[in-house]
C-alpha cells in the first residue's frame, strides 16, 4: 500500500472498524490499485460477510460498499471469496491483499 493511502486508512481505522463490526464483516482486505498505485482512482476490497440469508447478505454488501465509498471519497469495488473463481485473478488478489479488518 502506498504511503498516502496507508496514512488515509490508518487515520480512518476506527471508523472502518465500526462500519465492519456493525455490518457483521468477518474480514476486509484491500487489493488492486490501492496496493500498487500512488493515487488510486478506486479501491478494491475482498470482503467476507459470512453465511447469511440472501436478503441480509445483499443488504450488508450494498451498505458496506456505500459506506466505504463515503469514508474514502472514491468508488469502491467489493469482491467476495466465491467471486475468486478465476485462478489467475485469485492468485493476484492473494499476492496483493492487505488485511484491514478481522472480526
PLM region spans:
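Short, aliphatic-rich beta-strand segments
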Residues: 44-47
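Catalytic core of pol beta-like nucleotidyltransferases
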Residues: 1-29, 35-40, 50-103
Amino acid at each position: 500500500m502506498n504511503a498516502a493511502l496507508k496514512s488515509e486508512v490508518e487515520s480512518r481505522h476506527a471508523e472502518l472498524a465500526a462500519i465492519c463490526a456493525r455490518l457483521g464483516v468477518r474480514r476486509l482486505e484491500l487489493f488492486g490499485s490501492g496496493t500498487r498505485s500512488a493515487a488510486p482512482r478506486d479501491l478494491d476490497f475482498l470482503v467476507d460477510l459470512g453465511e447469511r440469508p440472501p436478503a441480509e447478505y445483499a443488504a450488508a454488501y450494498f451498505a458496506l460498499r456505500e459506506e466505504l465509498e463515503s469514508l474514502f471519497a472514491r468508488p469502491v469495488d467489493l469482491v467476495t471469496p466465491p467471486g475468486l473463481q478465476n485462478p489467475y485473478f485469485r492468485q493476484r488478489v492473494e499476492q496483493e491483499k492487505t488485511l484491514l479488518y478481522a472480526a
